[in-house]
Amino acid sequence: MTEFLRFPIKLTFALVAALMIGFHLNLETPRWAVMTAGIVAGGTAFAAGGDPYSGALRYRGILRIIGTFIGCVAALVIMIATVRAPVVMLLLCCIWAGFCVWLSSLIKVENSYALGLAGYTALIIVVTANASGGLTLVPQYAVERCSEIILGILCAILADMIFSPRSIKKVIDAEVDSLLVAHYRLLQLCVAHEDKEEVDKAWGALVRRTTALSSMRSQLMMESSRWQNTSRRLQMLNTLSLTMITQAAETFLIQNSRPDYIATQYRVLMEKEAATAEDVHKRMKALRRLIAVSSKTVPETLESWVEAATEYQLLTHGIKSNGRITALEEGILQREVVIQARSAENHHAMINGVRTFVATALGSLFWLYTGWTSGSGCMVMLGVITALAMRMPNPLMMAKDFVYGMTVAVPLGALYFMYILPNTQQSAVLLCIAIGLLGFISGILIQRRQIGTLGAMVGTINVLVLDNPMQFNFTQFIDNALGQWIGSFVALMVILLIRDKSKARTGRKLLNRFMYAAVSAMTTNQARRRENHLPALYQQLFLLLNLFPGDIDKYRIALTLIIGHQRLRAADVPVNADLSAYHRQLRHTADRIISVRSDEKRRYYFERLLKELDVYQHKLAHYDAPTSVTEPVTRLAEMLKKYQNTLVQI
């Protein structure tokens, strides 16, 4: 019960503290501080599906401060440059908002929040100044907005610190053990080589859990810098987990063509179940002893899996203790250079930026042309929704959430505006109870992810006259309520009308990147061979899982290419100038497949790559390359021929 009530109490405290401190400091519009506290605390909890872990709210608050400062500077620059042309000024703000949304769609989700804020903060400041009829007051509005927003953020952070936030460390400690057991179960399924569907489900679940563990590492670093050693171990643990998935899947794949790949003694040993991490540790000891005895007949993939699992267990002890990194661990951590993944959603990001610009620009032009009294509220809501919704995996659902919320905010805001707030003017305690009750009920519903709740809370606070002094002008209330509802509805219509058709394009680009990774692994350059692309490849595989849920064929293609990349990266390719030059040629052709725009050219380069792979196989035979090199190259060439149409055009 305490866990359930902690976040509603935290949100209530943040809202009331922001309101009272805002009035005490004589801020002109304390409602901006209250609304900021609600968005920072409520938005974090809505995303987490409950009370967020320690550090998440502070990190989000810092990003909001950074975004607000950037937005204020942008508003001042735009105003100084175009003070004599209000239309140009508003259009530049719309372009700035679209640019920020485009850029935020390309970077890490954790950091994109600051750019989203920077985009609509500039728009809000200029729109507010324009609505008041004094563009020369933009610097004053910028300072006021900064003060109010920072106050709201500090109140949210203070509430988070007082009401004992949860640490994610215990969850990580339990997950690393549970993940090892799941890895052993996947290896059992792959060695048994029976149910293909069950194997697909098992490795798909492991990819998701490994990705989730990587996200937990980011969350842990938000909590405190004292987890630095644990974070380094977790980063390498992510690579080891992905390596184990790859080796297990390759074991299954090899048995399709070589049923006798796994010797009987290994099959018998792998039949024993392991329910806990301690059981897996015992099975690992037995496997290592068997490998030491029969070193000449041990399957290569099984040996690689055992090596990765042994290092996994070693790092797990350090993760739980957070002790100093030993020399042995340091050797594991510095063995490879992790390469970050480039975004494959360039077209998706462009669509998001265009949606934001079109929505805000149309609203600006209509407002300036008609002189609509609700225009400023509509513009503010357009900027907020388009900036926040576009960063979500499903912008349409986020926009619907705001539409539902703004619809509820009209009667709820009217109740507060006409009956509750006027009766609290003589008592600060009654005012705190009224706002606190709104925050408490909203907090209960937000942590359950009740659709429309976050929008309703923000919309209700926005239409209330939490200003200094309070003035109950019913016409102004109607204007604000109507403006923000129309703004949310227009944002929804823009998302529906400007459709995002980049799904197939992104899927094809991802599959071709897997192909390029497999081809580029054929190299004799030692620096290139040290580059660890595995986390980036699985990050893109996770994106593919989200883009095409249930399309198991695409997952199998991607996983097969990742397996090919890992096997070729470890292969003992003969070192000579002829092969090195041909490796560069293969990489160039594979890169052209990704970069060209037309399907005809893409098909031409793909067919050229297949011919070059045939020539490469002849070269390997000529230079007496070992089976560990020729076999994965042959498998890669056959796989590319089989799925040529899928890789060229989804």
UniProtKB/Swiss-Prot annotation:
The keyword Membrane applies. It is found in: Cell inner membrane. The chain crosses the membrane at residues 7-27, 32-52, 61-81, 87-107, 115-135, 148-168, 365-385, 402-422, 426-446, 450-470, 478-498. Its main location: membrane. GO terms for molecular function: transmembrane transporter activity. It holds the Pfam family FUSC. InterPro entries: PHBA_efflux_AaeB/fusaric-R (IPR006726), PHBA_efflux_pump_AaeB (IPR023706). GO terms for cellular component: plasma membrane. It is a multi-pass membrane protein. One of its GO terms (biological process) is carboxylic acid transport. Keywords: Cell inner membrane, Cell membrane, Membrane, Transmembrane, Transmembrane helix, Transport. Belongs to the aromatic acid exporter ArAE (TC 2.A.85) family. Forms an efflux pump with AaeA. Could function as a metabolic relief valve, allowing to eliminate certain compounds when they accumulate to high levels in the cell. This is p-hydroxybenzoic acid efflux pump subunit AaeB. The lineage of its organism: Bacteria, Pseudomonadati, Pseudomonadota, Gammaproteobacteria, Enterobacterales.
